[in-house]
Swiss-Prot record:
Residues 23-246 are annotated as: DNA-binding. The keyword Ion transport does not apply. The modification N-acetylalanine is found at A2. Belongs to the PUR DNA-binding protein family. PANTHER family: PUR-TRANSCRIPTIONAL ACTIVATOR, TRANSCRIPTIONAL ACTIVATOR PROTEIN PUR-BETA. GO terms for biological process: positive regulation of transcription by RNA polymerase II; regulation of transcription by RNA polymerase II. This is Transcriptional regulator protein Pur-beta. Pfam families: PurA. One of its GO terms (cellular component) is nucleus. Residues 1-26, 275-297 are annotated as: Disordered. It comes from Danio rerio (Zebrafish). Residues 275-288 have a biased composition (Basic and acidic residues).
Length: 297
């Protein structure tokens, strides 16, 4: 980053030869700075032998830093989650003093409960997203934990059987959610298309240079998103069900699309036949009822 205040690994201890080698092997492709309230946020697109990724750093007023690392595919999911949080935040009315007091954890004004929560698990990383509120206002807390060995989630604290690294947390003021999401989306659009994790690298995705565009459908209060992607295992379809209160998704490998399509078509035809039989029975009952009324006359 040009101004030296990036979320990248600069300005710390030298770390010796290994640190120098990591710096040489990792290339910074782009950087974006956001100033939100009294905080600075840096979004750095980087690339190494494993592919492209985004490092997000929060720099507080005192110069303290917190960092998150997202693969490009996880960053794309984060972008979508941020859209959900933006929508939820927009629906919230102004807080009353009583609501703020209830959502605070005590005399220190710390947040006690979340207004909305989501979590994401990808490979050895877990991400927790919580929209919270305290005396200073509403904010999105994003926490990342990393599995460093066996026993992920057991034992904790890096003790025997516990392989969880101390988590990193950033707190994004709610007023900056849209600006942050848009900046992240721009970096993904500009640098995510050639990421090996998204394209699957040479030979993956069957060698296709392009994939079908994503789409969505609205059914009652639910929206279903269909997104085609690829990784080192091949092409897949991610189907996400999104409601105001939750989000769920499944991933279907390309080789199973035909089977899924056949199953959907079969069930659609069977339900159509069931509905027609049900409708015919209703007509028959109505005709019988009308016939009985005529006989009574």
């Amino acid at each position: 980053m040009a101004d030296g205040d990036s979320g990248s690994e600069r300005g710390g201890s030298s770390g010796g030869l290994q640190h120098f080698q990591r710096e040489q092997e990792t290339q910074e492709l782009a950087s974006k700075r956001l100033d939100i309230q009294n905080k600075r946020f840096y979004l750095d697109v980087k690339q190494n032998a494993k592919g492209r990724f985004i490092k997000i750093a929060e720099v507080g007023a005192g110069g303290s830093k917190s960092r998150l690392t997202l693969s490009m595919s996880v960053a794309a999911e984060f972008r979508d989650y941020l859209g959900d949080f933006i929508e939820h935040y927009a629906q919230l009315g102004p807080s009353s003093p009583e609501q703020i007091a209830q959502s605070s954890g005590g005399d220190d004004g710390g947040p006690r409960r979340a207004l909305k929560s989501e979590f994401l698990v990808r490979e050895n990383r877990k991400y927790y997203l919580d929209l919270k509120e305290n005396q200073r206002g509403r904010f999105l807390r994003i926490r990342q934990t990393v599995n460093r060995g066996p026993g992920f989630g057991v034992g904790g604290g890096g003790g025997p059987g516990g392989g969880v690294q101390a988590g990193q947390t950033i707190a994004l003021p709610a007023q900056g959610l849209i600006e942050f999401r848009d900046a992240l989306a721009k970096l993904i659009d500009d640098y995510g298309g050639e990421d090996e994790e998204l394209s699957g690298g040479p030979g993956a995705a069957g060698g296709y240079g392009e994939l079908p565009e994503g789409t969505s459908i609205m059914v009652d209060s639910k929206r279903f998103f269909f997104d085609v992607g690829s990784n080192k295992y091949g092409v897949f379809l991610r189907v996400s069900e999104v409601k105001p209160s939750y989000r769920n998704s499944i991933t279907i490998p390309f080789k199973a699309w035909g089977k899924f399509g056949g199953a959907f078509s079969r069930y659609a035809e069977e339900m159509k036949e069931i509905q027609e039989r049900h409708r015919d029975k209703m007509y028959e009952r109505r005709e019988e009822s009308e016939g009985e009324d005529v006989d009574d006359d």
